[in-house]
Regions:
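Short beta-strand/loop motif that positions the catalytic acidic residue
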Residues: 160-163, 167
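A short beta-to-alpha transition loop/helix N-cap that caps and shapes the active-site region
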Residues: 53-58, 140-145, 169
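Serine-hydrolase catalytic machinery in alpha/beta-hydrolase-like enzymes
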Residues: 2-108
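C-terminal catalytic histidine-bearing segment of alpha/beta-hydrolase fold enzymes
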Residues: 173-222
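Short, proline-enriched alpha-helix->beta-strand connector loops that line the catalytic pocket
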Residues: 154-159, 185-187
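Alpha/beta-hydrolase-fold catalytic nucleophile elbow
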Residues: 49, 110, 136-137, 162, ...
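Primarily recognizes the serine-hydrolase "nucleophile elbow" in alpha/beta-hydrolase
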Residues: 98, 105-154
């Protein structure tokens, strides 16, 4: 069961939305400080909570997770059912934003780690054009299915992909393998590397702000 997400908006004249998924074991509160630092009042930020589930890799411990993780590497064996369930939940949030008056092409899907995997998975299959994707410290899940399942609507959607050179949770090798797949299928990937581990840094936040301003620039709604 997916709970009510956190919403952050400081302006009545919202004309864009970012749906931002947290990483394994966290919740929607995890990126509230980052959203506040971005200072983008024309954007509504939606921060959903993943459901609790038993995570095989963590000895079956129950925690918030967008899908189960079975092996030592995220792509050793994948929980397609869990990934697809989370995709449907995020698509429902997109539909909600559209109903509230924000068109799909003014919506960005964002996420960190597991959340970034869901952002990529969902965006590349979504049937309407989205404004962009923020894929932070993550990888492309179910990558062997992308060619058959992708939507041409988001073939040219800008993807901001960032990774820490010292990341030991999702290695740079894993991330760059995903980058290569995206580039081979002609996706528009804006690649960034930072001197950090499995986290975010101030330089990255500044680059995220620049990206969001580029794809969701304020339309000055009165």
């Amino acid at each position: 069961m997916f709970e009510q997400p956190i919403e952050i908006s400081s302006n009545q004249n919202i004309n864009a939305s970012v749906i931002w998924m947290h990483g394994l074991g966290a919740d929607g509160n995890d990126f509230v400080p980052v959203v506040e630092m971005l200072d983008l009042p024309h954007i509504r930020f939606i921060l959903p909570h993943a459901p609790y589930r038993n995570v095989t890799r963590n000895n079956g411990y129950e925690m918030r997770a967008w899908y189960d993780i079975y092996g030592l590497t995220p792509i050793s064996r994948e929980d397609a059912t869990g990934i697809n369930e989370s995709q449907l939940a995020i698509e429902a949030l997109i539909a909600q934003e559209i109903k509230r008056g924000v068109p799909a092409n003014r919506i960005v899907l964002a996420g960190f780690s597991q959340g970034g995997a869901i952002a990529l998975h969902t965006a590349l299959r979504y049937p309407q054009v989205l404004a962009g994707v923020l894929a932070l410290s993550t990888y492309l899940p179910l990558n062997s299915l992308l060619a058959a399942q992708k939507s041409t609507a988001n073939q040219q959607t800008p993807i901001f992909m960032a990774h820490g050179v010292d990341d030991a949770i999702i290695t740079m090798e894993t991330c760059k393998a995903s980058l290569a797949i995206l580039q081979a299928q002609s996706y528009r990937v804006d690649w960034h590397e930072y001197p950090m581990a499995h986290s975010v840094c101030m330089e990255e936040i500044a680059d995220i702000q620049q990206f969001l301003n580029a794809v969701l620039g304020d339309l000055a709604v009165e």
